């Protein structure tokens, strides 16, 4: 059983938050904590890294489903894959948590910061950091760097994993029976994950078939 939630306050006395969301499993706990805290927020979905398009659409639709359940505005941004692949050139064989991931976070947060600036959000954050598979310092550095390009825009680097957040993330995913992605998102992550699985005698990832269930072990 997870710890009880604590109520949060936005930094800089901000009145609303732009939350970049990578997927429903990662954002579910963040969204419910923000609701519990009485924080006004909107979901910003900009993830041109997610490939192939079948996987992208499944992850986006799961996020939309959960946002609609809680009546949260959902900002569906351009898929923008051509720009992502252009920026990833030369980094195709970089490891997870390396410079390709930094580029990817930079690209997504640059767009989030621009949207925040143009639409009256003084603060933005992301659900990316709640995942134990991610380097939180790397993510926060990218968010802070993106915010620095605009006056009076702040990246909220709250640690969503703490105070039971990581445990509740899994509990919500099971309760909602979210789609359970098995790789980060980009084709290079899919390639490398499949290589590892095959080296362990496991089958390749099958897209669109695995979902969380209340009967899953903790």
Swiss-Prot record:
**Which residues hold [4Fe-4S] cluster?**
22-23, 101, 104
Query: InterPro entries from the entry?
Result: QueH
Cystine pairings recorded for this chain: 184-186
**GO annotation terms (biological process):** queuosine biosynthetic process; tRNA modification
Q: Tell me the pathway.
A: tRNA modification; tRNA-queuosine biosynthesis
Enumerate the GO terms in the molecular function aspect.
4 iron, 4 sulfur cluster binding; epoxyqueuosine reductase activity; metal ion binding
- E.C. designation(s): 1.17.99.6
PANTHER family, per the entry: EPOXYQUEUOSINE REDUCTASE QUEH
HAMAP family on file: QueH (MF_02089)
What family does this belong to? Answer: Belongs to the QueH family.
UniProt name for this protein = Epoxyqueuosine reductase QueH
């Amino acid at each position: 059983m997870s710890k009880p939630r604590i109520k949060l306050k936005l930094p800089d006395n901000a009145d609303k938050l732009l939350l970049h969301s990578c997927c429903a499993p990662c954002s579910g706990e963040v969204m419910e904590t923000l609701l519990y805290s009485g924080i006004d927020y909107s979901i910003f979905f900009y993830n041109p890294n997610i490939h192939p398009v079948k996987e992208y659409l499944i992850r986006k639709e799961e996020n939309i489903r959960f946002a609609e359940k809680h009546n949260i505005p959902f900002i569906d941004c351009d898929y923008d894959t051509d720009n992502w692949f252009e920026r990833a050139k030369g980094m195709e064989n970089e490891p997870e948590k390396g410079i390709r991931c930094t580029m990817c976070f930079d690209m997504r947060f640059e767009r989030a910061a621009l949207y925040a600036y143009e639409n009256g959000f003084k603060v933005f954050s992301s659900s990316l950091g709640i995942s134990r598979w991610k380097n939180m310092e790397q993510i926060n550095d990218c968010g802070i760097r993106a915010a620095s390009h605009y006056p009076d825009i702040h990246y909220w680097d709250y640690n969503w994993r703490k105070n039971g957040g990581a445990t509740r993330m899994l509990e919500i995913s099971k309760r909602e029976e979210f789609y359970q992605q098995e790789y980060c998102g980009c084709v290079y992550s899919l390639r490398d994950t499949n290589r590892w699985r095959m080296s362990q005698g496991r089958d390749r990832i099958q897209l669109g078939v695995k979902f969380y269930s209340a009967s899953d072990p903790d």
